[in-house]
Curated annotation (Swiss-Prot):
RNA replication. The central part of this protein possibly functions as an ATP-binding helicase. One of its GO terms (molecular function) is mRNA methyltransferase activity. Residues 699-832 form the (+)RNA virus helicase C-terminal domain. Pfam families: RdRP_2, Viral_helicase1, Vmethyltransf. Residues 59-224 form the Alphavirus-like MT domain. The keyword Transferase applies. Residues 541-698 form the (+)RNA virus helicase ATP-binding domain. The lineage of its organism: Viruses, Riboviria, Orthornavirae, Kitrinoviricota, Alsuviricetes. This is RNA replication protein. It catalyses: RNA(n) + a ribonucleoside 5'-triphosphate = RNA(n+1) + diphosphate; ATP + H2O = ADP + phosphate + H(+). It comes from White clover mosaic virus (strain M) (WCMV). ATP binds at G570, A571, G572, G573, S574, G575, K576, S577. The keyword Hydrolase applies. Belongs to the potexvirus/carlavirus RNA replication protein family. PROSITE patterns: ALPHAVIRUS_MT, PSRV_HELICASE, RDRP_SSRNA_POS.
Length: 1294
């Protein structure tokens, strides 16, 4: 597309352009006409952009107003989609007005039938009277459509609709349910609709118009997940056809058909931050936009020592003012703390590189790495590893997995209350989900509920009794919250396999652990296979042959398999594996159909003891299980301790497996891969992968006493109390749990039975000792929970850490420990704590923007710069130019054009000047008379000049002459002496002394330019000539200022304060603005512009001899190369005024500019707050003029404002472009001239500085960075007073 656009830009022939425009219009016109059918409304620009994203066009000329027109256009578009899908035969429409037929593209010939029930009063005026019915009538058509009402139905109502109408095969239905409401999040499309959450429900507000809102219950959101609806009489399949914002179109058909497993509503663009602080509620918990998260991450890592205030300012900069209401203050605090933490971690890889090592060091590097990793386990991870762990962001999604539902009367409340559908209390969630999916009769459950009416889990008592749990009493945690023995309930489909033993299936059904089909994650299996093949993980596996390793990896490369699984989650001591072990004890000794895979040898020994009737070959550690044949039923015990990806890889290579039983605890520790190079180290814990396939979490324990279990938030099924003691000494005969491998190994060497906090998972013992040291606060809550839940009767804490305030405060912040330690903490001696002097108060920063690393900003400009001679202009005669100077990369960004640079001088002459003859110039001048007339007439009208010529005023002429002479005499004596030659009467009045202008090129678009461009010439005329025509220009300027309309601002003899006032008073920021980027403005001012100047001078009655002299100078001007073509030269007296007036004349000749459009002009610079159309007459003369303009449009939104004379025109007033300001300051600092210009820079920068927080609405991120750097440089240079100055015409800030 870029090449096509470039090709079109190169077309300059007006006739060709006219043909192209006509052709384009022929395509645009029918599209605009068609868009009015579904979207006839005048839509706000932001909402129109959102609709366009969904493929809905908005006619920019539409004027029809609607309170929520954008949402109406979505409804109409979905109706069109429905009409496209419906057959031409008659159909029945439910809850739809007959007037909507036009959006369905259907008419009376289709003989459609409308059936509407008056459910609420406004339905009586919404639907036509002849379509209203008292009750449902029979549906006699194959197809029907229900409009925006299905979410108010129950599932049974829908099933009955199909059951009682056998002719109905397909039902199309639209729903209005925002998927983000499942999480109580703000609207994901705020330009279309908003959401309120209150009164135990949510209110959908289209177009922010409360009068058109709809109130919903959270229960209604179930419809977004329905995959199949089953009843004893029939089955229905749901498929989502379209989704636009909160509006969704579903197709419902009879029978069980395939429907996509996942429903996607929007792109995943949010992340969840890892929980790195304890307790968990002190971490960011809400999804955060990933783009903003990456911006914050790169910011805190690009700035040296960013402060808390800097990060707050950065977040304020990134979040639009209109979006601030979507964030909670406490969430912002947690996000800031998260980024403060990672900003202090080192992001430089602290491990050895292999490129600089000799061969013997490379051979020893793996050993060194292993030792280093072991040491890190003992002493804590390095800062680099901590940073990587802290950056494990989890993608947040609004997508949903479909769920199958049943409408049987005994199962009407079996909907899954998962983590995405928030409820007020967990007690409500359990009672709603405590349904009849259990192998018991309704009568038994009703009796259980009757006997225990006040227990939220009463319907689950029989399931709990099957686990030998008598949960008829309420228990509470330390915060007095009710502990629920059943949690995390998921409703899942039930599947069977004919080869599963009947007694095992009966057992699983009794426990409500029926198998369900689980798809294997190919990515996890492939990661594990790659790690095994490349010897990154494992011990036994590394000893396998290369062929075996290659074969193993190949088998895990691409898997498409689903396996029946029974996932059993429960607390430690809940009896997760007890029932399985009981069943296995009934098996024949030689039964090889069952294999138990264990993560540790200790756990394997425990199983062989508890199931002695089976041969030991049935019990395998996980690595041996990969190398040996296994049965068709697999039990993965404590599967969270298995390596990530192991289960998927195992099931991929063992195709004979028909059932996998997984037991684990999501609250306990999980496997951690120590090799960071392993792919599996980046995978999610297996417990998170399979938790959605667990029917419920059994939150009970037979191991721990109530006082211990309740402190852990677990329901205890035992009686008695637990003994807690603490001392600095270990007791004999009790295993010790230590937080680090180092302590565990040392204790083992001394003959003491010891395990780590994480490694004790699966252990059950009468008494246990828990070692507390400086590593304890570093342990995760899962690890602490594992350690605390091991003991039956007694826990002894061994405090080997410092007995100081800081140490105890750290332990208090560790989840679970604080509750226990309060019971047993020893009396501490009063400590004398030295009172530190309070730090000196830090003065509040003047700027509201976050700190920026200047090196990073500069680097973005210099890193792509080629070497000096690759950028310079080369001439075979004079060699390379010398515009790139010094070795300073900052200075090299700015070309320095110097008068003594011969190569640049000749390159400038070649690019800027064109020689001809005086005869050709006169011919050009006379041939362009008509165009000059047109230019002047348009200029006259634009500048409101009188109808009759302006009489000549000799006194005013004399005054202007004096002003010119006084200005000239203010030059230094040296400057006057240097110009002595041009003051001589012998100097040829037509001759021009040509010089190259010395200057630093600081235009924003030319900073760091890859190739040096031609410079600018200074044309030195005879001094008398300059004085005469400078007087003429000043004389006409006086009249121009007198007649200038209020809406036109000419930036001549004005101050920035004048310009600022004009912008604040006159400029319209509610529409796109327009600028004209002229090409070769000076060189293109040919005979037509000269004619315009002559006619303008005659209108002001300038004496004829002066006008004739001016024509002679313009047509006979000569340099040492010959006579110049008619053009504008920089050394003329009237250069600025003539350029400005030519700009105004050309702009008003080309464009239809309304009188209420604000306009600013200065030389070749201009801008208008209105996008004007081209006059038809201009197409007739455009080819006769050299002057060409390229339009530039600005939306006048954040980061896209018009620029004029180095100022940015913003809704808050004029401000200097921060990029140019900052880079100019950097240049001046690097050439040691900053002290000369700092005050003038500060006065210009003050316009932006004093806007304060309002700048967040104007600057994008890059501009904000440059603004902060410029502000800091000026303040450090002692210009704070200049930035705060109030009498500079900005505003009254007092």
């Amino acid at each position: 597309m870029a090449k096509v656009r470039a090709a079109l830009d190169r077309i300059t022939d007006p006739s060709v352009k006219a043909v192209l425009n006509e052709e384009a219009y022929s395509h645009i016109r029918p599209v605009l006409r068609e868009s009015l059918t579904n979207n006839p409304y005048a839509i706000a620009p932001d909402a129109a952009d959102t609709l366009e994203k969904y493929g809905i066009a908005t006619n920019p000329f539409a004027v029809k107003v609607h309170s929520h027109g954008a949402v109406k256009s979505i409804e109409n578009t979905l109706l069109e989609r429905v009409g496209f899908n419906l057959p031409k035969e008659p159909c029945i429409f439910l809850f739809l007005k007959r007037s909507k037929l036009r959006y369905l593209r259907r008419g009376p010939s289709n003989k459609d039938i409308f059936i509407n029930l008056a459910i609420e009063p406004r339905d009586l005026q919404r639907y036509e009277e002849d379509t209203l019915v008292e009750s449902w009538t029979r549906i006699t058509t194959r197809y029907a459509y229900i409009s925006d009402t299905l979410h108010f139905f129950t599932r049974k109502m829908l099933a009955d609709l199909f059951f009682h109408n056998p002719a109905l095969d397909v039902l199309y239905a639209t729903l209005v349910l925002p998927p983000e409401a499942l999480h109580k999040h703000p609207s994901i499309e705020p330009d279309l609709y908003t959401i309120n959450y209150n009164f135990n429900g949510f209110q959908y507000i289209p177009g922010n118009h409360g009068g058109g809102s709809y109130s919903h219950e959270f229960k209604q959101l179930e419809w977004l997940k329905v995959g199949h609806l089953k009843s004893p009489e029939l089955s229905l399949t749901f498929q989502m056809i379209e989704s636009i914002g909160a509006n969704h179109l579903f197709m419902i058909t009879r029978g069980i058909k395939i429907t996509p497993r996942v429903r996607t509503f929007t792109k995943d663009s949010y992340v969840l931050f890892p929980q790195i602080f304890h307790p968990r509620n002190l971490n960011p918990s809400k999804p955060f936009p990933k783009v903003k998260a990456m911006q914050l991450f790169t910011y805190v890592k690009s700035v040296k020592n960013p402060t808390e205030r800097d990060i707050y300012a950065k977040i304020r900069q990134l979040i639009k003012t209109s979006e601030l209401s979507d964030y909670h203050p406490d969430e912002i605090v947690h996000i800031v703390n998260y980024f403060v933490f990672i900003s202090k971690l080192d992001s430089i890889n602290s491990y050895s590189d292999i490129l600089s090592l000799p061969i013997w060091s490379k051979a020893l590097l793996p050993i060194k790495t292993k030792i280093t990793q072991l040491w890190e386990k003992l002493t804590g991870a390095r800062a680099f590893n901590q940073l990587l762990d802290a950056l494990q962001w989890k993608t947040f999604t609004y997508s949903l997995e479909v769920v199958d539902f049943s409408t049987a009367p005994s199962q009407r409340d079996c909907f899954m209350e998962d983590e995405r559908l928030e409820t007020d209390t967990l007690e409500d969630e359990v009672s709603q989900n405590a349904n009849n999916n259990k192998p018991t009769s309704l009568q038994n459950i009703e009796e259980a509920v009757k006997n225990n009416p006040d227990l939220p889990w009463a319907p689950w008592l029989l399931i709990l009794q099957a686990h030998n749990a008598d949960c008829t009493q309420k228990q509470y945690d330390p915060e007095n919250n009710l502990i629920l023995p059943i949690q995390e309930i998921n409703t899942l489909p039930k599947h069977q396999h004919p080869d599963i033993p009947t007694d095992l299936l009966t057992l699983l059904t009794k426990l409500h652990r029926e198998p369900t089909t689980v798809p294997l994650d190919n990515h996890r299996a492939r990661a594990y296979g790659s790690d095994v093949k490349n010897l990154r993980i494992g011990a036994l596996l590394k000893k396998q042959s290369k062929d075996w390793l290659a074969s193993f990896a190949l088998k895990t490369e691409n898997i498409e398999r689903q396996v029946l699984m029974s996932v059993i989650h429960g607390a430690g001591g809940s009896g997760k594996s007890h029932a399985i072990q009981t069943w296995m004890r009934s098996l024949n000794r030689r039964d090889r159909h069952v294999t138990i895979i264990l993560p540790t040898t200790d756990l394997r020994n425990d199983w062989t003891t508890k199931v002695p009737n089976l041969e030991q070959a049935n019990f395998k550690t996980f690595e041996k299980a990969l190398c040996q044949p296994c049965g068709k039923i697999i039990v993965f015990d404590d599967y969270s301790k298995l390596p990530q990806g192991y289960i998927e890889a195992f099931l991929a290579i063992n195709q004979n497996v028909i059932l996998a039983i997984l037991t684990g605890d999501s609250k306990q520790s999980f496997h951690h891969e120590s090799n960071e190079d392993a792919y599996t180290a980046t995978l999610e814990p297996s417990i998170n992968t399979y938790q959605p396939f667990c029917r419920y979490y059994l939150n009970i324990t037979h191991r721990n006493k109530p006082d211990l279990a309740n402190k852990l938030g677990v329901y205890s099924c035992s009686s008695g109390t637990t003994s807690f003691t603490m001392s600095s000494q270990a007791l004999k005969g009790m295993p010790i749990l230590s937080p680090s491998i180092m302590k565990k190994t040392a204790l083992g060497e001394m003959g003491q039975k010891s395990m780590t906090y994480a490694g004790c998972q699966g252990l059950t013992t009468k008494a246990v000792q828990i070692l507390l040291d400086t590593n304890t606060p570093l342990c995760s809550s899962n690890v602490i929970y594992t350690a605390l839940s091991r003991a039956v009767d007694h826990i002894h804490f061994i405090n080997t850490g410092p007995n100081s305030t800081d140490f105890w405060e750290k332990l208090d912040s560790t989840p679970y420990l604080k509750t226990f330690l309060d019971c047993v903490r020893e009396e501490r001696m009063n400590e004398i704590v030295a009172v530190e002097e309070p730090p000196a108060p830090v003065p509040a920063p003047t700027t509201h923007f976050p700190k920026v690393n200047p090196t990073t900003v500069i680097e973005s400009y210099v890193h792509d710069l080629p070497e000096k001679h690759g950028r310079e202009i080369f001439s075979e005669t004079h060699g390379h130019s010398n515009a790139i100077q010094t070795d300073n990369p900052v200075v090299q960004l700015f070309p320095h054009q110097q008068a003594k640079d011969e190569t640049l001088y000749w390159a400038t002459i070649e690019a800027r000047l064109q020689c001809t003859s005086s005869e050709e110039n006169l011919k050009e001048f006379h041939l362009k008379h008509d165009i000059g007339d047109i230019l002047f007439l348009n200029y006259k009208q634009a500048m409101n000049l009188p109808q009759d010529p302006i009489p000549f005023n000799p006194d005013l002429w004399t005054l202007c002459k004096q002003e010119i002479e006084n200005t000239y005499l203010k030059k230094s004596a040296a400057a006057l002496v240097n110009a002595a030659t041009r003051q001589s009467p012998d100097f040829d009045s037509h001759a021009i002394a040509l010089f190259l202008k010395s200057q630093w090129v600081k235009k924003t678009e030319k900073i760091g330019c890859l190739k040096i461009k031609a410079g600018q010439t200074i044309a030195a005329f005879m001094q008398q000539t300059v004085m005469i025509y400078g007087t003429m220009a000043r004389y006409m300027r006086k009249f121009r200022n007198q007649y200038c309309p209020r809406k036109i601002f000419v930036n001549c003899e004005t101050t920035p304060a004048d310009f600022n006032s004009f912008i604040l008073d006159e400029w319209n920021f509610n529409r796109t603005c327009f600028s004209n980027d002229f090409t070769a403005f000076d060189q293109s001012q040919d005979g037509s512009i000269l004619q315009f100047e002559v006619i303008k001078a005659k209108f002001h009655n300038i004496p004829e001899d002066i006008i004739e002299g001016y024509i002679q100078i313009k047509t006979h001007a000569k340099i040492f190369l010959g006579t110049l073509s008619i053009m504008r030269l920089s050394g003329e007296g009237p250069t600025f005024d003539a350029n400005t007036e030519a700009n105004i004349a050309y702009t008003h000749t080309k464009f239809n500019i309304p009188c209420d459009a604000a306009q600013v002009y200065a030389g070749d610079d201009m801008s208008i707050d209105y996008v004007a159309s081209v006059k038809p007459s201009f197409n007739m003369i455009e080819h006769l003029m050299k002057l060409k303009g390229k339009p530039v449009f600005n939306t006048q939104t954040q980061g896209d404002f018009a620029e004029f004379c180095g100022w940015t025109i913003s809704p808050k007033g004029i401000i200097k472009k921060p990029e140019k300001m900052n880079m100019s300051i950097e240049l001046q600092k690097n050439i040691n001239k900053f002290h000369e210009v700092k005050r003038s820079y500060a006065l210009d920068h003050a316009f932006a500085y004093q806007l304060g927080d309002e700048l967040h609405e104007l600057y994008n991120e890059s501009e904000a960075e440059h603004h902060q750097l410029a502000t800091r440089s000026l303040i450090l240079a002692g210009q704070a007073t200049a930035l705060d100055i109030l009498d500079y015409g900005l505003r009254d800030l007092k």
